[in-house]
């Protein structure tokens, strides 16, 4: 009888533990691209639209454009902001709701600073959405080192887009539009020298060539959906003729009917002889570099 009671008690404890424990998002990982070093790798996790989590070789976690909780492409396991785990830095490319998204809530949850181009941070502070100490402002071409001289280096660069902040004022409940700073992209240079250009939202512009020549990004995360940004044809011109990175991950597509561009159309426009390797992860899939 004592043994039966012990077995029943152990079973109950196990069931209660299973109910109490949160279910982590299922992990999917793509093999490292050929030719990449196995030491000092970086991890890129795309979560739909422009939302991206980058884990650096030194263990820093940088989240870009975290629109997650209402993003139809974000996997269910990542719609809880706590599923992102540790966050050291938040980058916002511009003020539109599908990019600013959950950044203020994530900043409050993790105490991570939000870096943004131009005046978006001041608007967030004045609206009471972000503490002033967490709203870090810098300008295009002004490289910053949030983690000190040996950590990742962040440079804001031009993006051909807009950046109005349209929202319901949390204090008044009224719909308002505020200045959202300048739209930017980010060159993120990791501790091992690997460079990522997260382009945010942008149309095609000629200085992509100059940015590519100056910063020499290894990887671009490039919008291909069209309507509000480059479509597949323009994105192919940017990658093949202007930037010439080693790798390209298409983003900002198929989230709404207007964003009709597809990775297949992007690859077809690039052509078979393109130097850049196109990687098409599913939302929630990790890619190592």
UniProtKB/Swiss-Prot annotation:
Molecular function in Gene Ontology: hydrolase activity
Keywords for this protein: Hydrolase
Domain of life assignment: Bacteria
InterPro entries found in the cross-reference section: Metallo-B-lactamas, RibonucZ/Hydroxyglut_hydro, UPF0173, UPF0173_UPF0282_UlaG_hydrolase
Xref: SMART domains: Lactamase_B
Family: Belongs to the UPF0173 family.
Family matches, as NCBIfam families: PRK00685.1
HAMAP family: UPF0173
Annotated protein name in UniProt: UPF0173 metal-dependent hydrolase H16_A2129
